[in-house]
A protein has these predicted regions:
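Extracytoplasmic copper-binding redox domains, predominantly the cupredoxin/blue-copper superfamily
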Residues: 22-194
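Bacterial N-terminal signal peptides
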Residues: 9-20
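Bacterial N-terminal signal peptides that target proteins for export
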Residues: 1-10
């Protein structure tokens, strides 16, 4: 299964720089508002039906007793390096999806995990239970976390019609259809509610 996925994904990834240079990709921008606004920054906007890409490696760091960033957006098949640039040992685990526990690791050590299921993964530390972050696994790399004002941009989207979805740690909004044209930015806003 993974090899057939790679046969489809690798050509798409190899074509993306050429499409980008020729102005043959578009983007999606928008704003998300939330009622209540408390959890707005725990929001990801993503394409549900975009084609997958070749796996990447991204990083989630630990500094000053915090996960950085608080939300890391990855695609199905990506590997995350969990770094420890703190002065104390940490443990990283998630009870969600394909639950995992990476064990305890000292400062300057790292662990990795490859995500094969789409969805949110709460990141916790058994040594410091007040710490919290999320890894959101999207079906493709066409996804983005919102900023503090709820704005987002999904770049390098091949032209086509898609289903745009939003995930939030506590709130919901219905999916929206979106059409992306080459060299243009499509716009889609969301209102999150309980």
């Amino acid at each position: 299964m993974r090899s057939s996925l790679l046969r489809v994904a690798v050509p798409c990834v190899l074509l993306l720089p050429a499409l980008r240079a020729a102005g043959q990709v578009g983007s999606i921008t928008g704003k998300v508002d939330a009622t209540p606004p408390k959890y707005l920054e725990e929001t990801v906007v993503y394409l549900k039906d975009a084609k997958p890409a070749a796996p990447r490696t991204l990083a989630l760091d630990q500094k000053a007793l915090k996960f950085q960033p608080k939300i890391l957006v990855v695609a199905k098949g990506d590997t995350v390096k969990f770094l420890n640039h703190d002065t104390v040992a940490h443990n990283v685990y998630s009870p969600d999806g394909e639950a995992y526990n990476l064990g305890t690791f000292k400062p300057q050590e790292e662990r990795t995990h490859t995500f094969d299921q789409v969805g949110p993964y709460t990141q916790l530390c058994s040594i410091h239970p007040e710490r919290l972050a999320f890894v959101f696994v999207a079906p493709s790399p066409h996804a983005a976390a919102v900023d503090a004002q709820g704005r987002y941009t999904i770049k390098d989207v091949p032209p086509g019609s898609y289903k745009l979805a939003v995930w939030n740690s506590h709130l919901k909004a219905p999916d929206k259809p979106v059409t992306v044209e080459a060299g243009k930015a499509a716009t889609a806003d969301f209102s999150l509610k309980r």
